[in-house]
A protein has these predicted regions:
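Subtilisin-like serine protease catalytic core
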Residues: 2-101, 113, 129, 188-191, ...
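Extracellular S/T/G-rich loop segment that most often corresponds to the catalytic His/Ser-adjacent loop
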Residues: 21-24, 180-248
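Substrate-binding/access-modulating region of protease and related hydrolase catalytic domains
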Residues: 60, 72-76, 91-187, 227-237
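Hydrolase catalytic cores
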Residues: 68, 73-74, 92-94, 219-275
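Outer-membrane translocation/initiation segment of Type V secreted surface proteins
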Residues: 252, 263-314, 318-320, 330, ...
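Extracellular beta-strand/loop-rich repeat segments of large surface/secreted proteins
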Residues: 367-442, 760
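Outer membrane beta-barrel translocator domains of Type V secretion systems
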Residues: 517-722, 814, 825, 837-862
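Outer membrane beta-barrel transmembrane domains
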Residues: 742, 746-863
Length: 863
């Protein structure tokens, strides 16, 4: 059992409490009552009905009552702190002489403000005709009852308000009419409390009326000061404030449940006629009811009806009534409960950690959850019985009513039945504890004096990565549990999706090593990996497994290498366009700069795809070494990013390189051009791993790329321009650095590896005659090229950090065999020796458009 709630932790925060009274303003010259409640006060209702003067003095009755409920300590007087200082306080003025309509208006207005607890430290005049049981105005057909009780009935039964009454100060054996009202109209009792005053020595205050005929809804309480605050008027607000604190602890409780909780947890003082249910016990009250008793339930069960929350009863609960759980929420029973009635779960959940004496009936929409609980009688299941941890002991019979019933149990959890267990074709669902890794095991699920029938279905709770079957004997049900092959499961679910299948094989390889470790063999698998593997085994759906596989796969490390090659090709294409400009007549030595940007896609069936972005630039110098020959040197920098879908992650590659390039040949006729470059890159990868939890892993590595390109072609001149067919060959070499992701059970580790791709190109360039316009003498260009490369796979061998000896292949997007380029460009000679140029290049692959590169630059030619 967890630590018991401390009453001091509850101050009524968020609970609306009303006070029907008068004399709220008091006298600020002589007391601080109004100042003390200023922080709690939300509204003064019916201010026109205030009567500040009574018997020639400043009235302060309502002010004192309010301060007892929610007042703060104020420097300068000795009045103590209120019982529930967190409440929202509403003061409602009621005249000394009032009508039934005025009372109804006050109660209705309070209800409209959300007030469900109302303190009433007032009464009708102390006249024998209002004294039950024989007073003439206490009869059901009396004028007073017929006039006022409909408003009270509306407040209790329509609005759900709990009305707390002062028991009166006439030293009588019974209270007067209002405190005893349920004696006249029994329907009021569900929302009625009357409070008699006692002293610290448990003696009834000499002026206080005894509970008498109101004993069943009467509770005893002290005022905050036995000597100064005399009268039941000042004991009642203590109980009203206590109700607010219980309401804070159990916000779902209606007026009847609040009443039952306060009365059932009171300390029995022996004489019911004097003290009712006994002395208020706040410490017990905030821990839930202590009785389910027909005297309190008024003939039925205690009803816990709430949605969307988990609420706990800590007290040992006795009584002759039962419990009905309604609503979707969960009610937790911690105590040793001996109430004799049945526990009926019509909806929602009852969590049993303690014990229940009577029968338990689980309806179709109900759940009984147990972890070490004891059911001391029969359990009938038409919904779900869920046992985990320390299981459930049933001292009677267990009866499942048919296929609509489910028994859900965890591996290692035993349901023990002293009587017979009648399974009745119901369903069995077996869940695996989060921290329990399964290889192959046999567990006992049920032990009984007699097992009758069988389960109609047996399923694994998660249902994907382990299997369950049941064996039956005369007295028990045993479970055979085995781990499923992850690769086989993935193949059945995701056939053709290479990335997921590779990830599944990787996990299966690591799980095989984990099996060996769990079974006692010497296997290099960390405890953290076993824990994460155990949680991963609990994956509950194909969608969840897909997300786990996508995130675990590490395919981003393979696929992002394709980004590196794409990055290299984009830089090479931009430089090739620049080299082609060297063929123009009059091209002399000079220097140039170029900026480029691009967007693209990485995609291949079966793998996570990515949107890519590229930024970069080049700075170069050209030198004409002969009439037909030019050599150049350029400095290149680039920054490429890729965001992968399907939990692939994010990749960033930043590079700096040098290129040597040249062209030999006249403007028209045959030519040869070439480029050789080397680039130093740093690549960062960030991704989330959704395997038995969420891990953010990061890695950085240093790569090197060497690129070679050679081209020959022939330029044919025409009146309108020039046509140049060409062929080219290229070679790219990527030396990828080692991969070492940050610590994590499923983090990847891989040694460095190199990749090569050779390719051939066939293309055609078009160039217009110079056009003279405001932007300068401009030449337009266009080209198309087909590229044929060897379809390089970028896979590599890796292992999980938590199972470093269980290596596997990481697959990702490879380099395609067939690609093509189309481009447009323009160059323009400005005044003097400055020219500008711009180009657009589009790359196409098997999936369509894969890359867009925009470039623009300036060149200055030397004299």
């Amino acid at each position: 059992m967890p630590a018991l709630p401390d009453a001091a932790a509850f101050d009524g925060t968020g609970v609306n409490v009303g006070v029907i009274d008068n004399g709220f303003d008091a006298d600020p010259a002589t007391d601080h009552h109004k100042k003390a409640v200023a922080g709690a006060l939300r509204e003064v209702i019916a201010p026109d009905a205030a009567e500040p003067i009574k018997d020639g003095k400043v009235a302060n009755h309502g002010a004192i009552v309010s301060r007892i409920i929610g007042g703060q300590v104020v420097s300068g007087d000795d009045f103590g702190k209120g019982v529930a200082t967190g409440v929202n306080l509403y003061q409602a003025n009621q005249r000394a002489t009032f009508t039934n309509l005025a009372l109804r208006d006050l109660l209705s207005t309070l209800n409209a403000r959300g007030v469900k607890i109302v303190n009433n430290s007032w009464s009708f005049v102390q006249d024998p005709k209002y004294a039950p049981p024989d007073g003439e105005e206490t009869k059901p057909d009396s004028l007073t009852v017929r006039a006022f009780f409909p408003a009270l009935d509306e407040a209790v039964n329509d609005h759900g308000q709990l009305l707390v009454w002062a028991n009166g100060n006439e030293s009588q054996p019974n209270p007067y009419l209002l405190a005893a009202a349920p004696r006249v109209l029994p329907a009021l009792e569900r929302g009625w409390l009357t409070v008699t005053q006692v002293f610290a020595n448990d003696e009834l205050a000499p002026w206080s009326n005894a509970c008498g005929i109101a004993a069943n809804w009467c509770i005893s309480a002290r005022s905050p000061d036995d000597k100064k605050l005399t009268g039941t008027s000042f004991a009642a607000p203590v109980v009203a404030a206590a109700a607010a604190r219980v309401s804070q602890a159990y916000p779902w409780m209606d007026n009847s449940a609040l009443r039952q909780t306060l009365l059932s947890t009171a300390d029995d003082m022996g004489n019911r006629a004097r003290f009712g249910w006994g002395r208020l016990n706040m410490a017990r009250a905030v821990r839930g009811p202590a009785l389910f008793d027909t005297r309190l339930t008024l003939g039925g069960d205690f009803v816990a009806d709430f949605d969307g929350m988990r609420s706990e009863f800590f007290n040992d609960i006795n009584g002759d009534a039962g419990l009905t759980k309604a609503g979707t929420g969960a009610l937790v029973l911690w105590g040793y409960n001996r109430y004799a009635g049945a526990t009926t779960i019509t909806k929602g959940t009852v969590e049993l950690y303690g014990s229940v004496a009577g029968d338990i009936s689980i309806q179709a929409d109900g759940v009984l959850s147990a972890d070490g609980g004891v059911a001391r009688h029969d359990v009938t299941n038409s919904g779900m019985l869920a046992a985990q941890g320390n299981g459930l002991l049933i001292l009677g019979d267990y009866l499942a009513t048919g296929a609509g019933a489910t028994l859900a149990t965890q591996l290692g959890t035993l349901i023990s039945v002293d009587g017979k267990a009648q399974l009745g074709g119901s369903g069995l669902r077996v869940d695996k504890p989060d921290d329990s890794y399964v290889v192959k095991t046999r567990e006992t699920a049920i032990k009984a004096c007699q097992v009758v029938d069988r389960f109609g279905s047996v399923t694994a709770g998660a249902g994907l990565l382990y299997t369950v079957s049941a064996d039956y004997s005369a007295t028990q049900v045993d479970l055979n549990v085995a781990r499923s092959n992850v690769a086989t499961v993935a193949h059945d679910l995701y056939g053709g999706q290479a990335g997921r299948l590779a990830a599944a094989q990787a996990i299966e390889t690591a799980f095989a090593a984990t099996d060996a470790k769990v079974l006692g063999a010497d296997s290099n698998v960390s405890d953290a990996f076993i824990q994460r593997a155990a949680r991963l085994q609990n994956v509950g759906s194909a969608a969840q497994l897909a997300a786990a596989l996508d995130s675990v796969s590490g395919q981003i490390h393979a696929s992002s290498q394709a980004l590196g090659f794409q990055q290299s090709q984009a830089v090479n294409r931009a430089l090739s366009n620049r080299v082609d400009q060297l063929a123009l007549a009059g091209a002399r030595s000079g220097m140039w700069m170029q900026m480029m940007g691009g967007t693209g896609k990485l995609k291949q069936s079966g793998f996570a795809g990515a949107d890519t972005r590229l930024y970069g630039g080049q700075l170069g110098v050209d030198h004409r070494v002969t009439d037909d020959g030019i050599l150049g040197l350029s400095l290149t920098w680039s920054d490429a990013k890729a965001d992968f879908d399907h939990y692939g992650g994010q990749s960033r590659s930043q590079g700096t390189g040098l290129s040597l390039y040249g062209r030999y040949g006249a403007e028209n006729g045959p030519y040869v051009s070439a480029r050789a470059g080397h680039e130093w890159r740093h690549a960062d990868v960030k991704r989330d791993i959704l395997a038995g939890g969420v891990d953010r892993v990061e890695s950085g590595r240093n790569d090197r790329v060497t690129s070679l390109y050679a081209e020959i072609g022939h330029a044919f001149a025409f009146d309108s321009g020039r046509v140049t067919p060409f062929v080219g060959v290229s070679y790219d070499h990527l030396a990828r650095g080692a991969i070492d992701e940050s610590d994590g059970a499923f983090a990847l580790q891989a040694r460095k590896k190199s990749y090569d791709q050779g390719a051939g190109q066939l293309g055609l360039r078009l160039q217009s005659s110079p056009l003279d316009w405001a932007g300068g003498v401009t030449t337009l260009t266009a080209y198309g090229a087909y590229r044929y490369g060897n379809p390089t796979r970028l896979d590599f061998t890796a292992a999980f950090a938590g199972a470093p000896d269980a290596s596997f292949e990481v697959q990702g997007i490879g380099l395609p065999r067939h690609t093509g380029w189309l481009g447009l460009g323009a160059s323009s000679q400005l005044a003097g020796d400055v020219s500008w140029y711009a180009s657009y290049d589009a790359q196409f692959g098997p999936g369509g458009l894969t890359n867009n590169v925009f470039a623009a630059g300036l060149r200055y030619r030397f004299q």
